[in-house]
Amino acid sequence: MRKIIVGSRRSKLALTQSQQFIDQLKRKHPNLEIEIKEIVTKGDQIVNVQLSKVGGKGLFVKEIEQALYDGTIDFAIHSLKDVPSVLPEGLTLGCIPVREDARDAYIAKHHIPLHELKPGSIVGTSSLRRGAQLLDQYPHLEIKWIRGNIDTRLAKLRDEDYDAIILAAAGLNRMGWDKSIVTEYLNPELMLPAIGQGALGIECRSDDAEVLALLKSVHDEETELCTEAERTFLRLMDGSCQVPIAGHATMVGESIEFTGLIMSPDGKEKYKVTHSGGNPIEIGTQVAKAMEQNGAKAIIETLNQDI
């Protein structure tokens, strides 16, 4: 087997989860020689603007995909939620390993439960999806934009006027944060996760048989089935980072149960549909069609026009 060059974003979380995946791969292939190549993406360079206002898709993957085309890397390790639902020609997801915790984590300055936050309390998030769901259930709260890595956001919670912040549980777990910092984990019934949240997507060239065979050894079929339902829904709804869109699928016995959600950013319009079955593409499609019939597509079209 040739030496493998792996592409990763330069952030601490990206490098940590990349190393964790490599360790998983090396347990299956102890003699594998592998090296990480750090790549800065457009999304990494945009630090003072809300990503939903930038528009476009693939803000955290395009430069890495170019490295795949150029042949300077052999595969790329992405957070699946950053990967557009339609991949460029010649590239494929070679594997999706076992998913981490898909939930969101609510962290309050004084560990005040979410339902006890007083009117006007400030909750920090970089996600329209989280903001819309919070405003739907707790319209008395104020949502304030926050960016930065986990350390930066926790420091802002401590030092600035935020009463609480919401982060992805998967990122906290991968970075080794103690669960005691989390005030409460938000179950999908309360806060539906982003499409693909908690999962990694390992992207490679479609014609690289050697790498595809290597990646297959750490692929998880259950995670693939669930995320395929989610990503089918995302693709059909043409969801992007300027649309509050969410979706989460789980296996219930032999069946895939998927719930999709589309909201207006202010939380006042809400479309939520659940379907279950054995075929992930059919389930994602059924939820998307039900959404269109209910009028959810109008929210997306309006928001896309505003960019």
UniProtKB/Swiss-Prot annotation:
Cofactor(s) in the UniProt record: dipyrromethane
Entry GO CC: cytoplasm
Broadest EC class assigned to this enzyme: transferase
Coiled-coil ranges per UniProt: none
Other information: The porphobilinogen subunits are added to the dipyrromethane group.
EC number of this enzyme: 2.5.1.61
Span of the signal peptide: none
Record has Coiled coil as a keyword: no
Catalytic activity: 4 porphobilinogen + H2O = hydroxymethylbilane + 4 NH4(+)
GO annotation terms (biological process): protoporphyrinogen IX biosynthetic process
Domain of life where this protein originates: Bacteria
Residues the record lists as S-(dipyrrolylmethanemethyl)cysteine modifications: 241
Function: Tetrapolymerization of the monopyrrole PBG into the hydroxymethylbilane pre-uroporphyrinogen in several discrete steps.
Cofactor binding: number and manner: Binds 1 dipyrromethane group covalently.
GO-annotated molecular function: hydroxymethylbilane synthase activity
Record family assignment: Belongs to the HMBS family.
PROSITE patterns per UniProt: PORPHOBILINOGEN_DEAM (PS00533)
Subunit record text: Monomer.
SUPFAM superfamilies registered for this protein in UniProt: Periplasmic binding protein-like II (SSF53850), Porphobilinogen deaminase (hydroxymethylbilane synthase), C-terminal domain (SSF54782)
Protein name: Porphobilinogen deaminase
InterPro entries, sorted: HemC, Porphobilin_deaminase_cofac_BS, Porphobilin_deaminase_N, Porphobilinogen_deaminase_C, Porphobilinogen_deaminase_C_sf
Pathway membership: Porphyrin-containing compound metabolism; protoporphyrin-IX biosynthesis; coproporphyrinogen-III from 5-aminolevulinate: step 2/4
UniProt keyword list: Porphyrin biosynthesis, Transferase
A matching Pfam family: Porphobil_deam
